[in-house]
């Protein structure tokens, strides 16, 4: 039996072969990748069926997945502490990393997910909430700081 959504399975038969039991443990998706696959905690992919609407959507080349997985906890914690939910994470070579929240806030992080980028985002979000600001875009790609866009 070869199904990519199966984590493991067990087939039990009675001593006389009169009945069989099949136990299947399915993989638990952690992300939706490119709206075509699920990815689990072991970074293995399996078919996407449209379920689990609350999973974070990832759109990036496969080789960039580990960069996000290594940085995700601090970003998710930061956003959750401010009652924001990350809906999607993308990487495009021309744009870099960017996040979109459930409130349609776009955060352009730049070329890497470094600690400096995280600290700049943390300070920017703190400033926004202290001053009751609601931009549609936070752009952290500038060396001098962050740009806030209220256009959308």
Task: Outline where the language-model segments fall.
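Short, well-structured beta-strand/strand-turn elements
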Residues: 2-18, 87
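Stable alpha-helical elements in mature extracytoplasmic
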Residues: 2, 71, 75-78, 117-124
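Solvent-exposed helix-coil-helix hairpins and adjacent flexible coil/strand "hinge" segments
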Residues: 87-120, 144
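Extracytoplasmic segments of membrane-associated envelope/inner-membrane machinery
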Residues: 19-94, 100
